[in-house]
UniProtKB/Swiss-Prot annotation:
Pathway listed: Purine metabolism; AMP biosynthesis via salvage pathway; AMP from ADP: step 1/1
Encoding gene, per UniProt annotation: adk
CDD domains: ADK
Protein name per Swiss-Prot or TrEMBL: Adenylate kinase
Source organism: Buchnera aphidicola subsp. Cinara cedri (strain Cc)
Gene3D superfamilies linked: P-loop containing nucleotide triphosphate hydrolases
GO MF assignments: adenylate kinase activity; ATP binding
Subcellular localization: Cytoplasm
Amino acid sequence: MRIIMIGPPGSGKGTQTQLLSKYFHIPCISTGEILRKEIKKNKKTKKYIKKTINKGKLIKNSFIIKIIEKNIKKKKFFNGFILDGFPRNIEQAKSLSKKINIEYIIYLKIKYDDIIKRITGRLIHASSGRTYHKIFNPPKIKNKDDITQEKLCSRNDDNEKTIKIRLQEYKKHTNPLIKWIKKKKKIKFIEIHANQSIKIVNKKIIYNINNNNINK
């Protein structure tokens, strides 16, 4: 099974990817985690990625396509995966669809006002990418990761000004992508309203996949 999770920043892609990975027993591929690994490799890459993300912009296609496709080829992903945060535009989707057969695309839809509320309260475990929220999904111990007990932090780009830029980028690139996906008969497109609890969103995703419900 090959599943792709798309949606605006703050829609809960990372959280739902982790939950689906456990339920279906298939590995997940996090675009954010891949970029964090790339940052560690050399200073030039680190500078470019951090500068781009902090501005709320998208990583250039040639760079992100290359590293995502390189990771997908790893042996552990041969029998399926859940990909979070890629593709983000039509060019990326076209490139990916030439390499693999995508079975499901899960689109988490949410109002932009709700996104700003979610992101401004978001907490991150830096080394793993696990996400929490001060109100909607708090850690068991305040400001500490549930698994490692390490301190949580906020992302530099999790401020209202940068969020609005990221949402503008999203509308510009990803809205046309969704229209493109809906035209592809071989891809099963599932749209879920993400302004519900994590548990309800997860149940709806699993129900739609198991019952082969699609929104086209």
